[in-house]
A protein has these predicted regions:
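Active-site-adjacent structural elements that line small-molecule/cofactor binding pockets in enzymes
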Residues: 1-240
Length: 240
């Protein structure tokens, strides 16, 4: 290892891409290799990726996320995993499976878990069950509205915001000309706002609309879905 103090983040492990047990095994291994410096980021993804890439139905994403985090935490505490949920039953009730314990010994039995959340209900869930939030397109001007459901989620479990991490995802372009640098970020924003999801269900597009750029969000999506990628990028407002 070349570092000793900097933490290692997972960015976003897609929940439909790994079983909870596989996720816990991966997290425990990375925590061990880093000497207790790993931070686990999770996200439920969206219907196109979940169903088109992973073959997992995108139904009840909030309930699925809750169960997933429950099981991951249980496994990382090295408890015998026995879970009777809507999406996961461990062990399966009609076969030879039995409750098992994680064989890897993580440095800590309570790894920090971050959720990538966008919608108000997912943000509230994040505040309730996670240790931090992985934010995209975070704006200080919109922080109060975005944080409100997280604060509500914390309150549901009698917790304050103390110790809760807010981690904005910020694309960085070095340079002295701000507008020229923004041109390099526009295609990145257009990909998410215009192409990540369907016309009816694109969480990034909905976020852009909630931030006050509804007409721009429509234009970016229209152009992107028409394969006018350059036009979609150009339609992303500089202020966004």
């Amino acid at each position: 290892a070349q570092t000793t103090t900097i933490d290692v983040g997972a960015a976003i492990f897609q929940i439909p891409g790994r079983t909870p047990a596989n996720c816990a095994m991966t997290a425990a291994t990375l925590d061990t290799l880093s000497g207790g410096r790993f931070r686990l980021g999770l996200g439920v993804s969206g219907p196109q990726v979940s169903e088109g890439w992973h073959g997992v139905r995108f139904d009840k994403p909030l309930a699925r996320t809750r169960e997933y985090v429950d099981i991951v935490r249980m496994a990382l505490r090295r408890e015998r995993v026995s879970y009777d949920g809507e999406f996961w039953q461990l062990p399966l009730p009609d076969g030879p499976g039995k409750s098992l314990t994680l064989t890897v010994h993580p440095v800590r039995d309570s790894l920090p878990i971050y959720l990538a959340a966008i919608g108000p209900k997912n943000l509230e869930l994040c505040g309730e069950i996670a240790d931090g939030w992985l934010a995209i397109f975070f704006s200080p001007e919109d922080a109060a509205g975005l944080m409100e459901p997280i604060v509500a989620g914390r309150a549901k479990v009698d917790k304050t915001m103390e110790g809760f991490d807010v981690v904005p995802t910020v694309p960085v372009v070095p340079g002295k000309d701000v507008e020229a640098c923004a041109e390099l970020v526009r295609p990145y924003a257009a990909l998410y706002v215009g192409g990540m999801g369907s016309r009816d269900k694109n969480f990034y597009n909905q976020l852009m609309s909630r931030m006050g750029y509804e007409q721009a969000a429509i234009e970016v999506q229209d152009k992107y879905m028409s394969k006018d990628y350059a036009g979609a990028a150009a339609a992303v407002p500089f202020e966004f």
